Amino acid sequence: YLDVMAAMLNAGADVNARLTKSLWYTTYNRDLLGVDRAGATAFWRAAYALDIDAMRLLLAHGADPHRPTLKVPGRNRAANPDPSDLAPVPLGGPAVSPLLAASGVGYGQGDAGNSHRHVPDGWLPAVRFLVEELGADVHFRDHNGYNAIHHAAARGDDAVILYLVGRGVDVTQMSRRGQTTVD
């Protein structure tokens, strides 16, 4: 797959092209993970797969390692108050960063962990790569108010949680649904 990626990039593929919508043939995985990939780039998808080799290849061709997915229209949750005190994210605004993808966005829902393919034991190495080598913002909050610790905690990943706490991420940050990682 890396050879195919390199060939496409060498032939002029736009390394920072964004998906304009979720792809119909990925709906099974999207439905279980609850992650809309509209706005995702190849780099974001490599981060989501914990694939450092693919991330390095994309970076060598000019990939932007900080480009998040984009917020799309969601369910009307007007009846549910937002206790987070976060500013609203407009449609088309930033949704899920590559760091949040690599920390496990979507894994706290249903049986998602059984459906997603990623590099075995790649969680902490991918998170460290994004933070230490690429300067990913460990304090980034997604459009739902979650940070990387929320996603790592949803998977029960103590190593990533401790790493992020060591980088200063606050475990008491509240999502738009009122959830913290210490509840």
Predicted features, each with a name:
Residues 6-14, 56-64, 128-137, 162-170:
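Ankyrin repeat domain, specifically the short helix-to-loop turn at the C-terminus of the second helix
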Residues 3-6, 44, 53-56, 100, ...:
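Solvent-exposed, polar/charged alpha-helical surfaces in well-ordered, non-transmembrane soluble domains
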Residues 1, 28-38, 45-51, 78-80, ...:
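Ankyrin repeat A-helix N-terminal signature
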Residues 171-183:
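Leucine-rich solenoid repeat scaffolds
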